Design a protein with these regions (language model features):
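N-terminal helix-turn-helix
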Residues: 2-93, 97, 256, 260-264
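Short, solvent-exposed recognition segments
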Residues: 3-7, 136-210
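Amphipathic alpha-helical regulatory segments at dimerization interfaces
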Residues: 30, 99-110, 116, 195, ...
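A structural signal for short hydrophobic beta-strand segments in well-ordered beta-sheet cores
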Residues: 68-70, 117-118, 219
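Amphipathic alpha-helical effector-binding/dimerization core
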Residues: 73-174
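Cysteine/selenocysteine-centered motifs that mediate thiol-based redox chemistry or coordinate metal-sulfur cofactors
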Residues: 160, 167-170, 255-267
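Extended hydrophobic
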Residues: 182-255
Length: 267
């Protein structure tokens, strides 16, 4: 055995540090899904799979840094104001958002129903844009900034369907404990992914709001990895079997247009 003079404890520090950072980010992603209402500590423990003492230490360290806040009335934990201040340091608008801007606006005007742009972030989806159409009844189930586990929305299923099968199964397994809150399970999500691959798009017969339906198509980066999804949501009577193929083709064309626009400089 070679003695290089380095304390074994020192050699393990970088690995432990990276693990601590990943755990803290996992906690932050779960808290982000709670939005302004926040989440109880028990929910964060369940969703992350970490022990309660570990989550407690992480949360209170993040509170000290202003990254997390504890709500006085409810005792729940939520994302803190320091996160917004850090986000303001981003130097420019995302090329994806810029490319999708006109496409979403034109689609909302043409189709009359609500359009969403959703991106993948880790094992979650994040709604980054929403456009309201002219039809009197609009489906507004998801707000910009809403975060959900990959697989519980039609956008999430579309993104998973565009991934290699093994990678998609791994994410579904990781999110399994979180699915119950959305009245679904891993087997149901996997079945929807398989159906989306056969169709070339996702058709959700029952949307996040009762009496609604949604269609989603994936958007791929130049390296062919899915980066986002476009979703059209409407009341069920607006998405019947006759209109579905037409709308799906329109969304597929829109996705291809965005893919072409982001080809030089996606990030």
């Amino acid at each position: 055995m070679v003695d290089n003079g380095i304390d074994p404890a020192v050699r393990t520090e970088p690995r432990k540090g990276a693990q601590a950072i990943r755990r803290a980010l996992a906690v932050l992603r779960i808290l982000a899904a709670g939005r302004e209402e926040g989440l109880p500590l028990a929910e964060v423990v369940r969703a992350t799979g970490l022990t309660r003492p570990t989550v407690h230490r992480i949360v209170h360290a993040l509170i000290e840094e202003g990254i997390v806040e504890r709500q006085d009335k409810t005792g729940r934990y939520a994302i803190g104001g320091q996160v917004l201040e850090l986000a303001l340091a981003r130097p420019s608008r995302s090329p994806l958002l810029a490319a999708a801007d006109d496409v979403l606006r034109q689609l909302a005007q043409r189709l009359g129903d609500t359009l969403f742009l959703t991106v993948r972030t880790g094992n979650d989806t994040l709604c980054v844009d929403r456009r309201i159409g002219s039809y009197p009844i609009q489906v507004l189930a998801i707000e910009v900034g809403a975060r959900r586990p990959l697989g519980v929305s039609s956008a999430g299923v579309a993104i998973l369907a565009a991934m290699p099968a093994q990678e998609a199964r791994k994410i579904v397994a990781a999110n399994q404990a979180r699915f119950a809150a959305y009245r679904t399970d891993a087997s149901g999500v996997l079945a929807q992914i398989a159906a989306a691959r056969r169709r070339g798009y996702t058709m959700r017969e029952v949307g996040l709001v009762q009496g609604t339906k949604s269609i989603s198509t994936w958007i791929k980066r130049p390296d062919h990895r899915p980066v986002a999804a476009i979703t059209l949501s409407a009341v069920r009577t607006r998405l019947g079997p006759r209109r579905e193929p037409e709308l799906a083709e329109i969304l597929l064309d829109a996705a291809r247009e965005i893919e072409q626009a982001i080809r030089p400089a996606v990030r």
